[in-house]
Amino acid sequence: MRKKFIEFDDQLINVKEIVFVEKVADTLKGQYGIYVNVRDYNYRQEWFKAKEDRDRRFNEIKEGLC
């Protein structure tokens, strides 16, 4: 079910303003992240120690956008 807002990076983001969501990794730090691009190239990010946690959160966000 499509949501109107998602909570990300300690903020509520209107899903209509999200341009794209992507998975990223910082292999030097051993961290996995998610970037959310909000209209006008305003990036938000969350970082995780485990790839599985990042993937789970990514799927939650994608489900909220559908």
Where are these regions (language model features)?
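Catalytic phosphate/metal-binding cores of nucleic-acid and nucleotide-processing enzymes, i.e., regions
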Residues: 1, 23, 52
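Short aromatic-glycine motifs in intrinsically disordered, low-complexity regions
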Residues: 1-12
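Intrinsic disorder/low-complexity segments, especially N-terminal tails and targeting/processing regions
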Residues: 8, 20, 36-38, 63
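Phosphoinositide-dependent membrane-docking surfaces
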Residues: 13-24
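Short aromatic-glycine-(Arg/Gly/Cys) micro-motifs in beta-strand/loop hairpins
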Residues: 23-43
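A short, exposed loop/beta-hairpin motif centered on an aromatic-Gly-Thr core
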Residues: 41-51
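A short, charged, amphipathic alpha-helix used as a generic interaction element across diverse proteins
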Residues: 50-66
